[in-house]
Curated annotation (Swiss-Prot):
Keyword terms of this UniProt record: Developmental protein, DNA-binding, Metal-binding, Nucleus, Phosphoprotein, Repeat, Transcription, Transcription regulation, Zinc, Zinc-finger
Entry protein name: Transcription factor Ovo-like 2
Effect of substituting residue 120 to Y: Causes obesity in mice. Obesity develops with normal food intake and reduced energy expenditure. Mice are cold intolerant with defective brown/beige adipose tissues. Reduces interaction with CEBPA
Superkingdom per UniProt: Eukaryota
Region feature (Disordered): 1-88
PANTHER family associated with the record: TRANSCRIPTION FACTOR OVO-LIKE 2, ZINC FINGER PROTEIN WITH KRAB AND SCAN DOMAINS
Tissue/organ expression: Expressed highly in testis, specifically in spermatocytes. Expressed also in skin and at lower levels in the ovary. Expressed in adipose tissues. Expression is lower than in testis and a relatively higher expression level is detected in the stromal vascular fraction (SVF) than in fat cells themselves.
Inducing stimuli: Down-regulated during embryonic stem cell neural differentiation and up-regulated by BMP4.
Amino acid sequence: MPKVFLVKRRSPGVSVRSWDELPDDKRADTYIPVSLGCLLRDPPEDCRSDGGSSSGCSSSAGEPGGAESSSSPRAPEPETPELHDAQGTDGHLAAMQRPVARSKIKFTTGTCDNSVIHNCDLCGKSFRLQRMLNRHLKCHNQVKRHLCTFCGKGFNDTFDLKRHVRTHTGIRPYKCEVCNKAFTQRCSLESHLKKIHGVQQQYAYKQRRDKLYVCEDCGYTGPTQEDLYLHVNSDHPGSTFLKKTSKKLAALMQNKLTSPLQENSTLSEEEEKK
């Protein structure tokens, strides 16, 4: 039998509250034990009016706010010999030492500010940032700016076009090290490792992974954009990637390419003089 179906034995000293008598709309309230009500630093108003007596405070602190104890019924807690012996000043200390089982229901009290949310007028989607809304609005454009050179299908984003073109070229840069199966996207590889091989990724939540720079002509992958530029410049001089590369990077790479050539030329001249 799987361990998830096994029932653990509960410790005898833990008092569990029964939620069957409460309505559904009040089961998510925070449970504050009656015995700990008088230990609050700021007692409710009815406790102050009673002169700070422990009986008045305990009766009003059974539920949050002190006013719901009369409207909602509360399950009687079992009496233990420890509570009978702990009367007077030691009663609260004994109650604090007794473990209390609290509800595992998670709830939030915050509300979203509608002024911060940016809504799409066409489909009703909401976004936190204006730039995300602007990127989303591109999918509603009837005119597709980026066309596939193989089949003519249009896309509004260059990333979507690159992902589609790989289905024609067969380039799959993300390869599984276990079964050598390759994928066009990193997310597909991560999903394959988790579902098929049970390999969990070791990076933290929202942590940026090492980016791969892929040559769309032959499938070469490099750790930096400079490595990709050097590869395309040497093996694919007529590639469109060189035209789309920024002028600053192109000038930088040209300097790196010419410097070794100049050094080789100077060395050859010195050897000829000798």
